[in-house]
Amino acid sequence: MDAEVVGLDPARGRVETTRGPVNYDYLVVALGAELAPDAVPGLAETAHTFYTWEGSVRLRDALRTFPVTGGRIAVVVTAVPYKCPGAPHEAAMLIADYFRRRGWAGKVEVHLYTPEPQPMPVAGPVLGDAVMEMLRARDVVFHPLHRIAAVDGRARAIRFEGLPPARFDLLAAIPPHRSSRVVREAGLAGETGWVPVSPKTLTTQHERVYAIGDVTAIPLPGRWKPGVSLMLPKAGVFAHAQGEIVARRIAAQVTGVAALSEFGGDGYCMLEAGEAMAGFAFGDFFAEPGPRVELRRLGRAWHWGKVLFEQWWLAPPGPRREALRVALSLGARWLGIPMVT
């Protein structure tokens, strides 16, 4: 059915759509995260974003026409959580690489601001330090613990809470994220604003209702600091794995066999750094006493692995998709890394 979901009624087992109501026996909520640029005064009117297709095209064009005299480019994480923990760092490094390849090194400054204490904090201090070194090596200035308050488009300045403003000539922002209106109005969102689920089974508080992907809030058992809880990041690799687990569990319930499949919290990502180079981070996010995540050194293999993964993901079912899956699986086995295909 090609329709938009306009309401959820877990108590009655019904989904309201633009083409009428649909009753269900099992429901999988995979409505993702919405962008809310209007939550930051001045952001929507001033900032570019690469978190939408249209925004990415506009940002590309703005970079192509950036003044030859140079200037300052700011990449800003406006709030947490956000989709893909490595995306802001990749964006900053790729922007710096773009101008370096144009011979503009020294004319363009790239600054990355975030309210987080380090890059990818859920992965721990060792990985965070490694990513900061990657940023430094690519002339990206990293500004942690900068919580945005507003953007002054006329003055071309970012206002932060309790810190001096930062000037920019071009601003690329990761807007605040929130769950969809449908999820909130259905009472599925918890205190965090996202749908709380059982970490391993992805079940919600409602019978026969599951949630997967960016819409979920999944607490992690480990800690990096006493009393400071961690949440599973929002990333496609987790949504992919969770979807397969939920499908198996529902199939088991329908056929009357034991539902044994569980989500294990394993995840990975390729971290693009420019120059056709990337790092590879992977590990067990459910590990204790803290998530056990490893970052492999920069290499071309990780970059081309990401290109191959994208082609596999976008390919329609058929021989080409299967060939790409086999190539990915063999490459992952050769490199000694996990890969969800």
Region locations from a protein language model:
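FAD-site-proximal beta/loop scaffold in flavoenzymes
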Residues: 43-69, 166-170, 174-241
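C-terminal auxiliary extensions adjacent to catalytic cores
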Residues: 279-341
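Cofactor-binding loop segments of dinucleotide-utilizing enzymes, especially the Rossmann-like FAD-
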Residues: 78, 115-117, 214
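Flavin (FAD/FMN) cofactor-binding core of flavoprotein oxidoreductases
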Residues: 154, 261-281
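A Rossmann-like FAD-binding core segment of flavoenzymes
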Residues: 3-15, 96-197, 257-258
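Internal hydrophobic alpha-helix adjacent to the cofactor/substrate pocket in enzyme cavities
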Residues: 97, 235-265
